[in-house]
Amino acid sequence: MLCVNVELQERRYPILIGSGLLQDERSYPIKRGDRVMIVTNPTVAQFYLDIVIYALEKRGCVVDHVLLPDGEKYKTLESLNLIFTALLQGNHGRDTTIIALGGGVIGDVAGFAAASYQRGVRLIQIPTTLLSQVDSSVGGKTAVNHELGKNMIGAFYQPSMVIIDTLTLNTLPKREVNAGLAEVIKYGAILDYEFFEWLEQHIDELVALNPEVLQHCISRCCQIKADVVARDETEKGDRALLNLGHTFGHAIETHLGYGNWLHGEAVSTGMMMAAALSEELGDISIADVSRLEKLLARANLPTVSPDTMQPEDYLPHMMRDKKVLSGKLRLVLLKSLGQAYVANDTAHTLVLNAIRRCTQTD
């Protein structure tokens, strides 16, 4: 087992990474008599809910659970209310613990519930997708979507622990594994050139879910994110760099309807658009743009815009992005592979040119 610590100004919490952690009662920092509400969905529940309940009950916990509908389109206030109803009907108080058992959607919605129920209860994240293991479960971002924009309603709320059991990836559809690799590649592209080179050497093993390679990869991603979050917990500085490709990607997700493209798929194409724009601005070389494209393609990820979207469709969605300040678009771009920066008020004509470069052609 590996342990990565997230060091914040006022406290710290561990990220446990290993194989078989869910069935080990020692993984859970909960004592006899504690109340627990597990938030999950039917897809995850069929594999792991009974395992987690059994481990918690062995510790003497009183365990309830609530099932949310599965999918990005259910990352809504309605799903949030289902959690509140379950907590209230079960007479859960401020001393309860919410466990988010699932992927990014479950983690975000359950996390927001923990942040807001009775003004805050303890949260444990148990991410079961690669994307949530390397990204969304770490760092305290919680949110639900609005029909006009992704993650528009939420809070920063840190978990007390993250438990990453790599065995959960064995039941993950290949498309979901590939989507998670987009966030993995992002870390190398923005902050760690050596890790990017390592990914070029090992991407095929990651696609094949080689256990040792996978554990090293997840640990490195969590360490990179933990370091960034420690410096900038509420995204006022360096943490914005973690959004490479996300402004373009969120436009894709919102325009197509949540869930038609997976988040990682949209981020993959978004990274290519950001790289194309960086090259237009004279930052990154065309050779490095090509390296990024080849690595994403080897991970079976899209690198061009959906054929149902026109370049002009992007900007209205992008201008509602949370990073927009005073009506000016702010984008994460690349100086080089391994070095990102935030560009302020980039000309819309250049943004459109970059999107056109990543548009499908017959």
From Swiss-Prot:
Keywords: Amino-acid biosynthesis, Aromatic amino acid biosynthesis, Cobalt, Cytoplasm, Lyase, Metal-binding, NAD, Nucleotide-binding, Zinc. Gene3D superfamilies: 3.40.50.1970, Dehydroquinate synthase-like - alpha domain. One of its GO terms (molecular function) is nucleotide binding. GO terms for cellular component: cytoplasm. Its EC number is 4.2.3.4. Pfam families: DHQ_synthase, DHQS_C. It is an enzyme of class 4 (lyase). Binds 1 divalent metal cation per subunit. Can use either Co(2+) or Zn(2+). Pathway: Metabolic intermediate biosynthesis; chorismate biosynthesis; chorismate from D-erythrose 4-phosphate and phosphoenolpyruvate: step 2/7. NAD(+) binds at residues 70-75, 104-108, 128-129, 141, 150, 168-171. Zn(2+) binds at E183, H246, H263. It catalyses: 7-phospho-2-dehydro-3-deoxy-D-arabino-heptonate = 3-dehydroquinate + phosphate. GO terms for biological process: amino acid biosynthetic process; aromatic amino acid family biosynthetic process; chorismate biosynthetic process. Its cofactor is Co(2+); Zn(2+); NAD(+). SUPFAM superfamilies: Dehydroquinate synthase-like. It is found in: Cytoplasm. Catalyzes the conversion of 3-deoxy-D-arabino-heptulosonate 7-phosphate (DAHP) to dehydroquinate (DHQ). Belongs to the sugar phosphate cyclases superfamily. Dehydroquinate synthase family. This is 3-dehydroquinate synthase.
